[in-house]
Amino acid sequence: MKFTKFLLLGAIGIAMPLLAGCGSSDDIQKEGRLSIVYYPGGYGQDYLDYFCKNFLAKEKNVSPDDIKPGVDYKLIADPDITYGASRYITSKSRCPDLIISNLLSTKAIPQGLIAPLDDVYDTQVNTSKGKKTIREFAMTEAVQQYTVELAYGQTGKYSFAMPWTAIPLSIAYNNTILQKIPHVSSIAVGSDAISNGKWVRAPKTVTELKAIFEDAEAYDNRLTKFGWAAVNGANWLETLIITWWAQKQGVDTPHLYPSEGSYYDFWTYSSEEIFKQTGLQDALAQVKDLLIKDEQFVNSFPTVGNMTIKMAQQSFAEGKALFCLTGDFFEKEYKSVIEQSGQEFKMMRVPAISGAVTKEDGETPLDLSYLNISSCAYVPAYAVNKKLAKDFLVYTSSEDNCLKMSEMTGAIRPFSYDARNNSGYSQMSSFTKSVYDLFYESDDYLVKYPRNVSPENISPIYLYENVSENVFYGCNYLTIMSSLKNLTPKQIMVDGKGDFKSVYDRAVEAFRDWRRRYGL
């Protein structure tokens, strides 16, 4: 595993609207009581209760049983915190000590609303390789992404957040069903994919994926081959698009198209010409080949045009689809449904596209994983217990506590440790183990961040214009997928057609404004 290649998903330029309401109570601030607002999805609250009790017990030299929720600490679950943090961080009277959220806007930094965490990063914690500062123990590039200029054009920088979890985004599959499917397609597959005439492993290439689609149709034509959603969920196709794009374009260095730059060169946002990368068109072409035929969605749920990603993942958990786009949280979110179905689910790597960049042998496709590491923890400037919150961040960043969080939640923390070493690993589900294997057995990672440039040279367009939230500037994923029904990838990305303005033409207009705004 290449920890030096471990980066954060750069969705940090997003604006935070002021929303009405709060968490569970107005009683947030209290001197001496640690208050944490957190996003409740995925991992629950038990691990936070555990950390708060054990941390505060150590601070107060008492037993964890003596630490009481509501008295010594307060946890506030807020499902709107991702886009609603401003109602906390702008309030001097209702500001928590710590926020754990999926996103943090860099626009809050020059406003002085986020406390610096350099002292936290420079504190030593225990690891299996001796004491290390958190800055050393965390992924270098993760630290860099959460270090920005105080404001564009100013001198001086500080680290403003701690990375919290690393979420591999990929394809889950129903292993119970997969191993019942006979291989009858004429498409050749790897010899290790089939045993006694039936599938025994997930497809490793797009060719094998197409083969099992045909086999699944012959086995049970009521079974949906690929679970995704067009309504509030088409963006999940980014998992496929980014992986196939990087495989054709090259990860750090150009692969098939030397004059166009690599995948990571795209995120430098050097000019509108980045949207002409052919690898991105190749990825769209592959999506179209798998999911669209005769201007209709195929290999998908019959009602995909009306489905949300939650509906798609629920149907997948019920055993109605063979594959589905999801993340490491899938099993926990749909635990009761999975238990009722009695079926086994696993996570697989996105199958390699033809012509993908290879390992040193020149034949085997590079094992790439697309990661979401935008989840972070930060201390608002108006917090009344800043030191307590910072000490809590230090406490949770030791290797033992990274392992403890993995044991309790199955989550992977973005630090230099192996979650498979946690004490509960042997009792973990095959799904969680497959997520760990996907993550730790990767040759490289894909995130939406310009890792080919130093932090001080990152474009202000990337930092402040929210460009990392969507690869296709000016078009959402539903528009892209709907347009793919009757347009070519090149028409979508570069040429346009009729009333459809290409992504490139939209970017030309945007770059004109950005150059004026930032003096580029």
For the regions a language model picked out, list residue spans one by one.
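Conserved C-terminal helix/tail region of periplasmic/extracytoplasmic solute-binding proteins
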Residues: 419, 423, 433-520
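Conserved N-terminal structural module of periplasmic/extracytoplasmic solute-binding proteins
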Residues: 5-9, 16-113, 125-132, 185, ...
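Glycine-centered hinge/linker elements that transmit conformational signals in sensory
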Residues: 210-213, 254-306, 350
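Hinge/lid segment of periplasmic solute-binding proteins
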Residues: 102-170, 185, 346-350, 358-362
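Short, solvent-exposed loop/beta-turn-alpha elements that line the ligand-binding surface or hinge
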Residues: 119-138, 185-201, 248-282, 354-368
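Extracytoplasmic/periplasmic substrate-recognition and gating elements
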Residues: 155, 338-420
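Extracytoplasmic/periplasmic solute-binding protein
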Residues: 147-165, 169-171, 205-272
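Short helix-initiation/N-cap motifs at beta->coil->alpha
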Residues: 74-84, 204-208, 301-317
